[in-house]
From Swiss-Prot:
Residues 40-90, 330-349, 663-736 are annotated as: Disordered. Ag I/II A repeats lie at residues 146-220, 221-302. Residues 703-717 have a biased composition (Pro residues). Belongs to the antigen I/II family. Keywords: Cell wall, Peptidoglycan-anchor, Repeat, Secreted, Signal. The gene is pas. Residues 43-60, 75-86 have a biased composition (Polar residues). InterPro entries: Adh_isopep-form_adh_dom, AgI/II_N, Antigen_C, Cross-wall-target_lipo_motif, Glucan-bd_C/Surface_Ag-I/II_V, LPXTG_anchor, SA_I/II_PAC_V_sf, Surface_Ag_I_II_A_rpt. It is a peptidoglycan-anchor. GO terms for cellular component: extracellular region. Residues 1281-1310 form a propeptide. NCBIfam families: isopep_sspB_C2, LPXTG_anchor, Streccoc_I_II, strep_RK_lipo. This is Probable cell-surface antigen I/II.
Length: 1310
């Protein structure tokens, strides 16, 4: 397809014809714009009709999607920034022409270059700058030409003077050379004669020296030969003597060494004998002392053994009884779910001694620790004499001179004994410090233990190995972790990688490997000893947990701490603050009941604790803290992405937080064994030493010969120094004559310049605030300002100044408002093409042409209109044409309305969709589910505001207000306005929003009706409306920040719905800036509860024979069959109450004390198990009987009802055994109560005839009952009284429970 060239059309100008024709010719195109006034579209007198449009927004007014842009608008925007033509500018050049003329007269070669084009500039300012540049260049060219001309004249005069000077200088040089050459010749002749005389004298002396030297050398050689002969004889004799002496010495030293060795062996043997004798003596004395001590201890233990055994047995008996009680209470708050006695007593060791060793870490000086506390983030508390360990910036510990070889304790000790710490307040706390990196360890040994026992035996030593978990994600650049190891092992460790800044996605974990030792320094082999894991806090940004542990986790009932994926922490709820994230109590004291649980002496400290059973000699557990978002998905309540300090204080001890845990304090004694007396030793005898060897006599060494001294050699004569011949004078150099100056060439040029004035389009709201690339509400007034830059100085006269603006689709143009906002222009509007044209008036043109030598500021017109579509983008630019010679298209501006996903200018923009969901009391969504009468629906309404973030609507638009309408079904639901809660997306309480309730639209005030009418909303009946009290404050707080609001509006299902059953629906609307949007519709169904009553003679649920309305003989045993209402599957909330209340006529019927309850349908429990229809459920019920009033209540146990899955149906039937004791007609009705709502059954009626008086009553024969075919055992009725029954066993005493709300029901009297 060939692309058509887009052009502009102007009269008479070739430039204009290529740029602007399509815009001014747009009036020839017919495009229909079906816009209507905004106020007209909002009025409605019918029921709310939510249009489904291409916008994707459920709008109740102005629902139409934005139409396609006009061809003119698309063409104009595609050419944004294009220009054609320009305005020429001239600059004077008189001085340059004069300079060129004078240079030519002076003989300079003058050349005129081609003209230079200075280009086309965009603004008057740029044009003025270019003109200045051209003027300056013309001036510079003239100056350069004049300078060249003057220089050339000067150079010619200087050349002539220099030629005369050089000629005179060359003549003087020639005369001086001839004079110097004559003097040189005379000096050479004198030097040659003196050198010849010196040479003859030297040669005579040299001959005499050579003869004397020969004689001296011959005498010295003879003396040297004689000396060498004597020296040889001396050396031979010396060698012989030295060898003889050495041999004698070696023989003597060997004898001495052998003797010393023999004596050393004897001495060593004697020393060993002495030691063995001493050791034997010491061992005997030690054994004797030990025997005496053991004998005394044996006698003492033997006397104490019976008492210790008695105390041990008594304690074990108490523990056994306590464990029985704990087994019964194990499901109660604060009790161990696996009851056990605490065999490890390990609660406190304030006097323990601590030693630390590390192979790869760094032990720290206490002075360095003190200095670190006194600075940075811990300084404020330090100045208050408080050591706040979690505030310490550990960078203060990372110093070159911080290391020490042994542990140095620090804390509120010594000169800080009056200080406090966040670990023990005023209690003395001290610790040793070490720096470790990931994977590095420190070993801590605790001795001098006074209070620690296992199974009643004293623990003497504990060894811990603390290792920084290599998977810790703390962000300290140095990789260091500070461990403060407390001297009391029960206080544990404070670990920190805190560098003064909180961290996101961080963690710190320490592995603890530990072994306990007995008094014999042997490792203790634990057998299911309990170790406490307590104070495991979980906030919305942090989770403290234990992991990678030996042993088995034991949960405490009611505690927030549980085990998940091998980790111990608060798995389901937060436990920081009551009511947040499911927390039952607040961890710190705040005056509320149960607050302050995070303290070892709090009665509910078990809420943040658990226990681990450990066995064996060596155990380990890893503890630490981690950002919540690294454990669970990010959530505004349970896991927020805020920073935390990467540190933790944890302790491992035996202080189990569960209640009533018995401790084993008595050791199981063993019968003492009498010690054996030691045997006295036999001692060895020492051996004598050998005598020393005799020393040898040595030979004297010979005397060495003396050499004869050499005669000295004569001195050699010195050769004389000869006088050098002088250098002859240099040949003269004559200076050349200078070259005449060259004739210079100068160039000059002229310039060309043109201007293209720029344009700028701005988009404003009704408050004149720039809204380009931003967001404004639908129906907002949007203004387009068409601005042109200054016209330049030196321009031609302006004869026409025209601006053409093709407006965007969906923009409702206001012609009169535009004229008022655009003085100085004639305004015309073409509705077919949605184009507005502005032409400068004659007065405006006269202003532009008043002084053409100066630049002039232009005026601009303003387009006024409204945006009428959801999720729409309004783009716009315009065209300026000046004098049919210059044309330019402006920039494109755009503004968007909310309701448009994927908006590149406003990332938060998305569909405007208020939502409504129905939840039960546990927060489970129950949309579409069956709900029971009397239950509470917690409707959660979302006021969708996030798409308005960074909105720039004007004040008048904001004042239209913000409303939320809840159109609920009053025929089915009872509004609980007292329980309504409004929170923002961050969970904060919303203020400044009022709520009103109206029984109908007609009952609402006119102001409310107007708001709803303009928004196109008509509630079906009763409704509640939420409104922002101050629209401006509401807008500033929530709307422009894009913060959604959540309204929770509880409503109770009316009890009469259970009598009739049926479905009901619920819908809501939000109104923002006068624009309405509908939520989804929520539908629920209420089942009809229809209990039934029969009279039967058997206990078989399959037997449908009903004797209602028939005759029952006197003294007959029969059953009232109470069939409960059916609860459909997939219901919304747990069952907690399902009762049968039968107000029988005690004058004619007597309850035998027997009843039976069966499942009427298959029942699925939460654990997935299924109770088949017909199964005996009696064990899950209790009964209460009032024989005087004739009332019986059978109740299902609440824990059983709550174990039934909400996805399962539920129905039960009860058989109540009666005996007819009187004649007459008796009526009976029972009440089935389901979750506090009572439903009456049908009335049964039976008649018993009067027995003949003459007859002796026969002994009644019991009715034969069929067994339950679905049960493997015979069906028997449990007793609730003491009435005899020959065929049904006694099943125990049943607890009596009150009848909830049904005590006033009366039976029918005969």
């Amino acid at each position: 397809m060939k692309k058509r060239k887009e052009v502009f059309g102007f009269r008479k100008s070739k430039v204009a014809k290529t740029l602007c024709g399509a815009v001014l010719g747009a009036a020839l195109l017919a495009m229909v714009d079906q816009q209507v006034a905004a106020e007209e579209t909002t009025k409605s007198n019918s029921t709310t009709n939510v249009a489904v449009t291409a916008t994707g927004n459920p709008a109740t007014n102005l629902p139409e999607a934005q139409g396609s842009a006009s061809k003119e608008a698309e063409q104009s925007q595609n050419q944004a920034g294009e220009t054609n033509g320009s305005i020429p500018v001239e600059v004077p050049k008189t001085d340059l022409d004069q300079a060129a003329k004078e240079a030519k007269s002076a003989g300079v070669n003058v050349v005129q270059d081609a003209d230079v084009n200075k280009g086309t500039v965009k603004t008057a300012g740029e044009a003025a700058q270019k003109e200045t540049e051209i003027k300056e260049d013309y001036t510079k060219q003239a100056e350069d030409i004049k300078k060249t001309t003057d220089q050339y004249k000067s150079d010619v005069a200087a050349h002539e003077a220099e030629v005369a000077k050089i000629k005179a200088k060359n003549q003087a040089t020639k005369e001086q050379y001839e004079k110097d050459m004559a003097a040189h010749k005379a000096e050479v002749e004198r030097i040659n004669a003196a050198n010849a005389a010196s040479k003859a004298a030297y040669e005579t002396k040299l001959a005499q020296y050579q003869a004397e030297l020969k004689r001296v050398q011959e005498a010295n050689a003879t003396n040297e030969a004689n000396y060498q002969a004597k020296l040889t004889a001396y050396k031979t004799e010396l060698a012989r003597v030295q060898k003889a002496n050495a041999d004698a010495k070696a023989a003597y030293e060997a004898a001495v060494a052998a003797n010393n060795a023999a004596n050393a062996a004897l001495t060593a043997e004697n020393t060993a004998i002495k030691k063995r004798n001493a050791d034997a003596k010491a061992d005997y004395e030690a054994k004797l002392a030990k025997y005496q001590a053991d004998l005394a201890k044996y006698q003492k233990d033997l006397a104490e053994y019976p008492q210790k055994l008695k105390e041990y047995n008594e304690e074990q008996a108490k523990i056994k009884e306590a464990l029985k009680k704990l087994e019964q209470d194990k499901n109660k708050d604060g009790h161990l779910t696996e009851p056990s006695a605490q065999s490890l007593v390990y609660d406190s060791e304030p006097d323990a001694k601590l030693s630390l060793t590390t192979e790869d870490g760094t032990l720290l000086k206490s002075s360095v620790v003190d200095e670190a506390f006194s600075k940075s983030t811990s300084k404020a508390k330090y100045d208050q004499k408080i050591l706040q360990l979690d505030d310490l910036d550990i960078r203060g510990l990372e110093k070159a001179d911080s290391a020490t070889s042994t542990v140095e304790l620090y804390g509120n000790i010594g000169n800080k004994s009056t200080w406090t710490t966040n670990v023990g307040n005023n209690t003395e706390v001290k610790w040793g410090s070490v720096l470790l990196k990931r994977g590095q360890s420190v070993t801590a040994t605790y001795t001098n233990l006074q209070k620690t026992y296992y199974n009643g035996k004293k623990v003497s030593k504990i060894v811990y190995k603390y290792t920084v978990d290599k998977d810790s994600k703390f962000q300290n650049p140095s990789g260091n972790v500070w461990l403060g190891v407390f001297s009391d092992p029960t206080l544990g460790v404070f670990a920190s990688a805190y560098t003064g800044q909180v961290e996101k996605d961080t963690s710190i974990f320490i592995k603890n490997e530990f072994t306990f030792y007995d008094e014999n320094d042997q490792p203790i082999n634990f057998d299911n000893a309990l170790l406490s894991v307590a104070s495991l806090n979980r906030e919305n940004n942090s989770i403290e947990m234990a992991k990678d542990y030996t042993g088995k986790f034991v949960r405490i009932s009611g505690s927030s701490i549980d085990e998940k994926d091998g980790k111990i922490y608060a798995t389901k709820t937060l436990n920081f603050k009551k009511g947040q994230g499911g927390s039952r109590w607040t961890m710190y004291p705040n005056g509320q009941e149960g607050s302050g649980w995070d303290s070892s002496d709090a009665p509910n400290s078990w809420y943040g604790a658990g226990a681990v059973k450990i066995s064996g000699q060596h155990n380990s557990i890893t503890l630490g803290a981690i950002s919540a978002t690294l454990v669970v998905p990010s959530d505004s309540v349970m896991a927020v992405e805020t920073g935390k300090k990467p540190n933790i204080w944890y302790s491992l001890n035996g202080k189990i937080r569960a209640v009533n845990v018995p401790k084993i304090t008595k050791e199981n004694p063993t019968p003492p064994v009498e010690p054996t007396a030691p045997q006295a030793p036999t001692y060895e005898v020492e051996k004598p030493l050998n005598p020393a060897p005799v020393a040898p006599n040595y030979e004297k060494e010979p005397t060495p010969p003396t050499p004869t001294p050499d005669q000295p050699e004569p001195n050699k004569p010195v050769e004389p120094t000869y006088e050098a011949i002088p250098t002859p004078p240099t040949d003269p150099v004559y200076q050349n004559l200078p070259t005449p100056p060259a004739v210079p060439t100068v160039h000059f040029r002229y310039y060309k310049l043109a201007v293209q004035p720029q344009v700028n389009k701005e988009i404003k709201n009704n408050n004149d605030v720039d809204i380009d690339k931003t967001l404004v509400a639908k129906q907002s007034v949007v203004k387009f300002q068409l601005k042109t830059a200054d016209l330049p100085a030196g321009r031609a006269k302006t004869t026409s100044f025209v601006l053409v603006d093709p407006l965007p689709s969906g923009y409702q143009f206001n012609l009169e408002a535009t004229k008022a906002a655009s003085p100085g222009f004639d305004v015309s509007y073409d509705k077919a093409t949605n184009t507005v044209t502005f032409k400068a008036t004659a007065a405006t043109l006269a202003t532009f042409n008043a002084d053409l030598t100066k630049s002039v500021a232009t005026i601009y017109p303003t387009v006024v209109g409204q945006v009428l579509n959801d999720g729409a983008t309004y783009k716009n630019n315009f065209t300026l044409t000046v004098n049919d010679a210059y044309g330019i298209k402006s920039n494109v501006v755009r503004v968007t309305t909310p309701g448009k996903p994927n908006d590149p200018d406003n990332p938060n923009n998305n569909y405007i969709k208020p939502t409504k969901v129905n939840k039960n009391e546990n927060g489970v969504v129950i949309d579409g589910k069956t709900v029971l009468a009397g239950s509470t629906n917690y409707y959660e309404l979302t006021w969708d505001l996030d798409q308005y973030k960074n909105d720039r609507s004007s004040a008048d638009t904001i004042q239209k207000g913000f409303y939320y309408v809840d159109d609920y079904p009053e025929e089915a639901l009872e509004l609980r306005q007292d329980l309504v809660k409004i929170t923002d997306a961050n969970g904060n309480k919303v203020t400044g929003v009022s709520v009103d309730h109206y029984t109908s639209l007609e009952a609402a005030p006119q102001e409310v009706r107007d708001v709803l009418s303009k928004a196109g909303i008509r509630p079906k009946g009763a409704f509640q409306i939420f409104r922002a009290d101050n629209p401006r404050e509401f807008y500033d707080t929530y709307v422009k920040n894009g913060i959604d609001l959540k309204i929770v509006s509880p409503m109770v299902v009316k009890k009469q719905m259970g009598q009739t059953g049926g479905s009901y629906e619920n819908q809501a609307y939000q109104i923002d800036f006068g624009n309405g949007y509908a939520s989804n519709i929520v539908i629920n169904n209420v089942p009809k509860i229809n209990p039934k009553k029969d009279v039967t003679l058997t206990l078989d649920p399959a037997d449908t024979n009903n004797v209602d309305g028939q005759t029952i003989p006197l003294n007959t045993v029969f059953n009232y069959r109470l069939i409960g209402g059916i609860i459909p599957a997939d219901h919304s909330e747990e069952l907690f109450e399902y009762n049968f209340y039968d107000d029988y006529d005690q004058t004619g019927d007597r309850y035998t004390g027997q009843y039976k309850v069966f499942a009427k349908v298959d029942i699925t429990l939460k654990d997935g198990s299924v109770i088949k229809s017909g199964t005996d459920l009696t064990q899950h019920t209790t009964a209460e009987v009032d024989a005087t009033k004739g009332a019986l209540t059978i109740k299902f146990k609440e824990d059983f009802l709550r174990s039934v899955s909400i996805d399962s149906a539920f129905q039960a039937e009860s058989y109540i055994q009666m005996k007819r004791i009187a004649a007459g007609t008796f009526e009976n009705t029972y009440v089935n109560t389901v979750n506090k709502v009572a439903y009456a059954s049908n009335t049964v009626r039976t008649t018993t005839p009067q027995a003949p008086r003459s007859e002796v009553p026969k002994r009644p024969t019991p009715v034969s009952y069929l067994t339950n075919k679905l049960s493997s055992a015979p069906a028997t009725l449990p007793q609730t009284g003491t009435t005899d029954s020959s065929y049904m066993p006694y099943l125990g005493v049943i607890a009596l429970l009150s009848v909830l709300g049904l005590g006033q029901l009366k039976r029918n009297e005969k």
